[in-house]
Amino acid sequence: MAHAAQVGLQDATSPIMEELITFHDHALMIIFLICFLVLYALFLTLTTKLTSTNISDAQEMETIWTILPAIILVLIALPSLRILYMTDEINDPSFTIKSIGHQWYWTYEYTDYGGLIFNSYMLPPLFLEPGDLRLLDVDNRVVLPVEAPVRMMITSQDVLHSWAVPTLGLKTDAIPGRLNQTTFTATRPGVYYGQCSEICGANHSFMPIVLELIPLKIFEMGPVFAL
């Protein structure tokens, strides 16, 4: 989960998030290299005393600074496309959960368990217990198993929302009249937090998402025992 004054990304809890962190580091390394080369060229330009007013032809140099950026773009695009296709891949999910965005709360439906439906509201400050997180904890958590592919079906009943849990590498828009889907496989148990990531009105900041990930054997005893 996130920590106060955190600079980097949250720890990965799914294979997709691990890939995203790796791609982030890969792209950042290329960006730092480009910045270093540009600053070095500027430094040489400002410090050298040699000047020339003659226009010279440099076909080799022009070829290099045309091909080199193309190679850099390919090095960034290929892993990016790979992750993009991974996020769209649906691998025979074991469970399906439907999430419906409202102003300003979420409704969840366990479609594999008799259509169990419940609402999830942010806990007001007066109802917070010791250890609860302000603006992040909810009255009803979504309980899901680890080490099992889960499919989220996401939509909205009023305006645009976005269902996002950073530690799982998930962010899917909730669009009225449209049903989007995403899958994930959590790799470790715990409680993980997210929020609506699409400005949806005055109380946009008060739409937290809380996932409680538990071992599969415990989940099979009753998927909503923690509610």
Curated annotation (Swiss-Prot):
Keyword check for Cell wall biogenesis/degradation: no
Topology class, membrane: Multi-pass membrane protein
GO biological process: ATP synthesis coupled electron transport
Positions on the Mitochondrial intermembrane side per record topology: 1-14, 88-227
Cofactors (names): Cu cation
Mitochondrial matrix side: 46-59
Stated name of the protein: Cytochrome c oxidase subunit 2
Localization: Mitochondrion inner membrane
Subunit comment: Component of the cytochrome c oxidase (complex IV, CIV), a multisubunit enzyme composed of 14 subunits. The complex is composed of a catalytic core of 3 subunits MT-CO1, MT-CO2 and MT-CO3, encoded in the mitochondrial DNA, and 11 supernumerary subunits COX4I, COX5A, COX5B, COX6A, COX6B, COX6C, COX7A, COX7B, COX7C, COX8 and NDUFA4, which are encoded in the nuclear genome.
Binding site for Cu cation A1: H161, C196, C200, M207
Annotated EC: 7.1.1.9
Pfam family, one: COX2_TM
Binding site for Mg(2+): E198
Keywords: Copper, Electron transport, Magnesium, Membrane, Metal-binding, Mitochondrion, Mitochondrion inner membrane, Respiratory chain, Translocase, Transmembrane, Transmembrane helix, Transport
Cofactor info, note text: Binds a dinuclear copper A center per subunit.
GO molecular function, one term: cytochrome-c oxidase activity
Catalytic reactions on record: 4 Fe(II)-[cytochrome c] + O2 + 8 H(+)(in) = 4 Fe(III)-[cytochrome c] + 2 H2O + 4 H(+)(out)
Entry binding sites for Cu cation A2: C196, E198, C200, H204
Membrane-crossing residue ranges in chain numbering: 15-45, 60-87
